[in-house]
Regions:
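A structural motif
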Residues: 36, 152-155, 205, 281
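C-terminal beta-strand-rich structural cap/linker in extracellular carbohydrate-active enzymes
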Residues: 418-436
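Short catalytic/ligand-binding loop motif for oxyanion handling, primarily in non-cytosolic enzymes
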Residues: 47-53, 107-113, 166-170, 195-199, ...
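Structural recognition of the beta-strand scaffold that forms the well-ordered cores
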Residues: 7-9, 38-42, 66, 100-102, ...
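Solvent-exposed beta-hairpin/edge-strand motifs
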Residues: 402-415
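Substrate-binding/active-site clefts of carbohydrate-active enzymes
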Residues: 1-38, 42-153, 174-182, 186, ...
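Loop/helix patches that line or flank the sugar-binding groove of alpha-linked glycan CAZymes
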Residues: 49, 251, 256-398, 403, ...
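Active-site-proximal helices and loops of the catalytic beta/alpha 8
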Residues: 145-148, 156, 161-245, 262, ...
């Protein structure tokens, strides 16, 4: 699973008319134009709804009541809902993209009546769920059957929920059993403790959230002025694990980047976005509507609710663009154009698979370079070399970057340094001349 991947998370019930059929050539074509490799469809397995214990009106996608069914409300003809789901997956494949769904090994819905062994209690405030009993010897086999069922529908991988609450060795056995039957299947883990990264990679996961690393640091830089030096420290901590990380600034659990509770607007976060997308070969995830500056202003907590039917304004605007060819409001169009520019750069082979060189250490004393507010790095391969400056400060950055000889030789550069400028909270890119 080498190379940077672009993953797009979406809650289908809030996209278009909320049906599998909405995922057609216009929708997939739009995501293909962004360079998306995998679409993570959240809320596919049938979850509890319409009962007193559920959260919100439709209920939580993470309280699954039947692991071998899809939500009837996603189908035009509920009696054919599995076939409609398979057809959607096939359309994605025809458009050159792969599909992920959630695998939730820690819990099921409170009204679950299937064959997975379940305890009588729940974790935390997940009152609509019951804990899966991983001490029961039947559980691994039951969970393997779930994964086989969905992989047989054409699904290309799984985003695995809250894996730190489940024995890693047992998850590892399941993943190992899936590999021969479904070569190329992807397992992406929601992991929060950096101290657990190695253990879950050893268990066979392909990608891990870098939540307590890149996400927490970038968020704290934006909100509280945390030093950009800590990005270097995280990079050094990750070492050889970097290609297996998933960078993101939004998902369904986190507050919207443009919300008042986070950056406040996209213009305050371009340096962070550029870092998350372009630094090393870690994969990158977008949350639907992020690319047009959706700010969840309809909510009190800065999050797009996964418990309701209400479609965010930014996603509604996207639907008008995708299905009717309507123009986005100017502010949203400007944000989308900026994301397109960065995503286009990220698709270049040098950014997908090339080497990374953190240049902060050799520029700490350079005039104009603020190691707490600036982060500079290079990406290079046999064909290209690029310089990237991320400016987390509130004033324009103008720096004459110095290169150590070992980097210059490794990247095949003629120059010994370059001057580069980046706007406040923004970034700058420069392509080097390489030796012929």
């Amino acid at each position: 699973m080498q190379g940077k991947k672009i993953i797009y998370q979406v809650l289908p019930r809030l996209w278009g008319s909320g049906r599998f059929s909405d995922w057609d050539e216009p929708a997939f074509g739009y995501l293909r134009s962004l360079g998306v490799d995998y679409i993570w469809f959240t809320g596919i397995p049938r979850h509890a709804t319409g009962k007193d214990f559920v959260k919100g009106n439709p209920g939580s996608p993470y309280a699954v009541t039947d692991w071998f069914d899809v939500n009837p409300y996603l189908a035009v003809n509920p009696a054919s809902r599995i076939d409609e789901f398979k057809a959607m997956v096939a359309r994605a494949h025809d458009c050159g993209m792969k599909c992920l769904i959630d695998f939730i090994p820690n819990h099921v819905a409170a009204d679950y009546e299937g064959s997975i062994p379940v305890l009588s209690w729940h974790d935390g405030d997940w009152t609509d769920t019951r804990k899966v009993n991983w001490n029961d010897p039947r559980t691994p086999g039951e969970m393997l059957d779930v994964l086989r069922f969905w992989a047989a529908t054409g699904v290309d991988g799984f985003r695995c929920d809250m894996v730190e609450l489940v024995p890693s060795d047992k998850l590892g056995h399941i993943i190992k059993a899936m590999r021969p039957e479904f070569p190329g299947i992807l397992f992406m883990a929601e992991v929060y403790g950096r101290e657990n990264y190695g253990r879950y990679l050893d268990s066979g996961f392909d990608l891990l959230y870098d939540k307590s690393g890149a996400y927490d640091i970038l968020r704290d830089i934006i909100q509280n002025g945390r030093s950009a030096r800590e990005l270097t420290w995280n990079w050094q901590f990750l070492g050889g694990m970097q290609p297996s990380m998933l960078n993101f600034l939004e998902n369904h659990d986190e507050q919207r980047l443009s919300s008042l509770q986070f950056a406040g607007n996209p213009d305050a976060a371009w340096a962070a976005i550029a870092f998350a997308l372009l630094f090393n070969t870690a994969s990158f995830m977008l949350y639907f509507g992020q690319e047009v500056g959706e700010d969840a202003s309809e909510s009190e907590n800065g999050r797009t609710s996964i418990f309701d039917w209400s479609t965010p304004a930014g996603v509604s605007d996207l639907s008008q663009l995708v299905y009717k060819g309507a123009s986005l409001p100017p502010a949203r169009n400007e944000v989308l154009s900026s994301y397109r520019e960065l995503l286009t750069i990220a698709r270049r082979p040098v950014f997908r698979n090339g080497a990374t060189w953190d240049l902060c250490y050799c520029n700490a004393g350079t005039e104009g370079f603020d190691p707490d507010r600036h982060f500079v790095f290079a990406r290079y391969d046999d064909d290209e070399a690029w310089l990237v400056l991320c400016n987390f400060g509130s004033s324009r950055a103008s720096v004459a970057i110095s290169f150590p000889d070992e980097f210059r030789h490794a990247a095949g550069l003629v120059s010994t340094g370059s001057s580069i400028e980046a706007p406040p909270h923004g970034y700058a890119l420069m392509k080097f001349n390489k030796k012929q």
